[in-house]
UniProtKB/Swiss-Prot annotation:
InterPro entries: DYNC2LI1, Dynein_light_int_chain, P-loop_NTPase
Source taxonomy: Eukaryota, Metazoa, Chordata, Craniata, Vertebrata
Record-level GO BP terms: cilium assembly; determination of left/right symmetry; intraciliary retrograde transport; intraciliary transport involved in cilium assembly; regulation of cilium assembly
GO MF, any single term: dynein heavy chain binding
Protein known as: Cytoplasmic dynein 2 light intermediate chain 1
Keyword rRNA-binding attributed: no
Superkingdom per UniProt: Eukaryota
Biased composition (Basic and acidic residues): 323-335
Amino acid sequence: MPSETLWEIAKAEVEKRRSHGSEGDGAEIGEKSVFFIGSKNGGKTTIILRCLDRDESAKPTLALEYTYGRKTKGHNTPKDIAHFWELGGGTSLLDLISIPITVDTLRTFSIVLVLDLSKPNDLWSTMENLLQATKSHVDKVIMKLGKTSSKASAEMRQRMWSVVQKDHPDRELIDPFPIPLVIIGSKYDIFQDFDPEKRKVICKTLRFVAHYYGASLMFTSKSEALLLKIRGVINQLAFGIDKSKSICVDQNKPLFITAGLDSLCQIGSPPVPDSDIGKLQAHSPMELWKKVYDKLFPPKSTGTLKAVQDPARDPQYAESEVDEMRVQKDQELEHYKRSSSKTWKQIELDS
């Protein structure tokens, strides 16, 4: 009997993985993926490069970027592979969120939301838009997964509650994100010079949001010590390395709070006088915190959040043949516009 061909072996391996995946036995299936979303120019690429030990300068992310990393857990063992995705453009490209998050990748997927602490007026809208868009898509994928494997879907929903202990006093008051979520506040070196009261509001607000979604929260900057902490957290998501149990809730220091270790009691109420809380009409705790935050940091108009640069003119994406053809077509278009304008003017004169 002839030996199996490489193609037959590969086909059998794919079918084997599919059969294991449909069983939904709760095992860690496949290679892990980490999706970085967040503020435009917030430092997402820098964090990824640091986690992968790549000594290269960060370039602006145009749309959706992909890279991967490998790590060996032990001697003579195959390297684990992790996939890193990054969404550029802040909140301007929300439709691209659906590309990397699929039924096949969902169970090994994590989200890292990077927020620029130096721009507090953009912070809430960036966070809200990205988390809502991501959660909406993930919920749809979970429903789709449930149609093929109800057990796998149920295990996913059970797993999202695993970050909160069963006896946690806030268990009935929070709504964990459907997949692991880490919120990183970047540019702490600028943030630490803010007015203490402003720092207090931002810290308490982010602590509430992170706790409500069952997420980890940490601040970082160019400091090597902080970057090493962040690297450890990302490695845990990407390669399953032991999770840190350290915690720092002092608003005068970089926050570092692992999911499930905070509480509403420790966070306290929104930083607003009790007499004003009744005036803020809110239908949920999240809405109340938003109103309090927006009062101190009014969101900028949508127009100021949009990218003003034209990526087609960015020199790092130059393609001589394409650019020459683009110039030619632009000239032809201008010529057509002028010709059309003259034609319409002539028609108006004749009439």
